[in-house]
């Protein structure tokens, strides 16, 4: 078996970065962006393993924790954008070059930067380049598909800090500063998995809401999202 490669943690503090397994990341992306996204594809976009050596990664490598690959929240946001672009036929080569130019302009995780949302695809390209021509053809797609996704992302210091997978008007959020980025109720921080489990035990939505101090709407949003994640898994 090939040796796993990634960024080993050592004494690195994980507070506030969010942590998602490859399968969890794929489920989030399949639910919101591209149903065909696979675990292997995410790893291919993130880094090159021995058996995938012919593929040059797009984003930085995942963390390696006790033999398991974990993506940070910023990486999850980047992977979501990559998946959306690939779903519309933008080549990996064009996305990779756009990411490289974005990193030069914005620093690490350019696809998770607020500038990407405001400036669009063109900010990462050089006039006349191969990828500029290709990505310009996708500008309408960017406005119709990518913008709605990024509109549900909140930023702190220009970096993605919170994502509302059901939309900003709904109560479910992914926030790396809360519960390591697991989906939670926006107002209380109660994990959606907890609300879902209690509902599945036979309790009414009203009883669950009263027990955890959340609204009935929050309980129903949690059930909807957790059900969707399980279908996407």
Predicted regions and their residues:
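Long, charge-rich, low-complexity alpha-helical segments
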Residues: 188-233
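Basic, low-complexity segments
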Residues: 51-53, 142-180
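Major-groove DNA-recognition helix of helix-turn-helix-type DNA-binding domains
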Residues: 35-63
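Short alpha-helical segment immediately N-terminal to, or the first helix within
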Residues: 14-15, 85, 197-198
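Short, Lys/Arg-enriched anionic-surface-contact patches
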Residues: 1-12, 169-190
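Polyanion-binding surface elements
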Residues: 11-42
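Charged mid-protein connector segments
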Residues: 90-153
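A short, Lys/Arg-enriched interface patch at domain edges and termini
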Residues: 68-99
């Amino acid at each position: 078996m090939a040796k796993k490669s990634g960024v080993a943690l050592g004494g690195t503090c994980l507070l506030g970065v969010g942590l998602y397994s490859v399968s969890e990341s794929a489920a989030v992306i399949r639910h919101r962006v591209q149903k065909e996204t696979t675990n292997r594809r995410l790893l291919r976009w993130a880094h090159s393993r021995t058996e995938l050596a012919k593929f040059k990664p797009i984003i930085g490598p995942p963390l390696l924790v006790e033999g398991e690959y974990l993506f940070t929240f910023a990486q999850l946001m980047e992977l979501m954008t990559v998946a959306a672009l690939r779903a519309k036929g933008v080549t990996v080569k064009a996305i990779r070059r756009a990411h490289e130019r974005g990193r030069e302009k914005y620093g690490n995780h350019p696809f998770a930067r607020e500038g990407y949302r405001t400036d669009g695809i063109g900010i990462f390209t050089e006039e006349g380049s191969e990828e500029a021509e290709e990505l310009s053809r996708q500008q309408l797609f960017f406005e119709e598909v990518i913008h709605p996704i990024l509109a549900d992302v909140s930023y702190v210091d220009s970096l993605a800090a919170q994502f509302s997978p059901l939309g900003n008007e709904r109560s479910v959020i992914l926030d790396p500063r809360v519960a390591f980025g697991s989906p939670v109720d926006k107002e209380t921080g109660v994990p959606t998995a907890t609300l879902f489990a209690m509902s599945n035990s036979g309790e009414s939505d009203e009883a669950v809401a009263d027990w955890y101090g959340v609204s009935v709407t929050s309980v129903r949003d949690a059930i909807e999202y957790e059900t969707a994640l399980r279908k996407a898994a």
